Swiss-Prot record:
Organism, as annotated: Gracilaria tenuistipitata var. liui
Subcellular location: Plastid, Chloroplast
Gene3D superfamilies xrefs: Ribosomal protein L28/L24
GO MF terms, alphabetically ordered: structural constituent of ribosome
Keyword Ribonucleoprotein: yes
Family of the protein in this entry: Belongs to the bacterial ribosomal protein bL28 family.
Major localization class: plastid
Keyword terms, alphabetized: Chloroplast, Plastid, Ribonucleoprotein, Ribosomal protein
Single Gene Ontology BP annotation: translation
Listed name of the protein: Large ribosomal subunit protein bL28c
InterPro entries the record matches: Bacterial_rp_bL28, Ribosomal_bL28, Ribosomal_bL28/bL31-like_sf, Ribosomal_bL28_bact-type, Ribosomal_bL28_sf
A single cellular component GO annotation: ribonucleoprotein complex
């Protein structure tokens, strides 16, 4: 199962952990996924989706 936001399509990012002696080791920066229930007027029921917190903030801003 891919850690991906269903609304924005965001995925994990590759990066490096850099030590004091500048030795770089790879790491994965995961997105902050949350399970959220959203009311669908079209289907007249709650839909459970996994979305990132940036998408949740946008939904609150749009008052959805």
């Amino acid at each position: 199962m891919v850690k991906e936001c269903t609304l924005t399509g965001k995925k994990s990012n590759n990066g490096y952990t850099v030590s004091h002696s500048h030795i770089r080791t790879k790491k994965i920066q995961h997105i902050n996924l949350q399970t959220k229930k959203i009311w669908s007027d079209k289907q007249k029921r709650w839909i459970k989706i996994k979305i990132c917190t940036k998408a949740i903030k946008s939904l609150h801003k749009l008052k959805v």
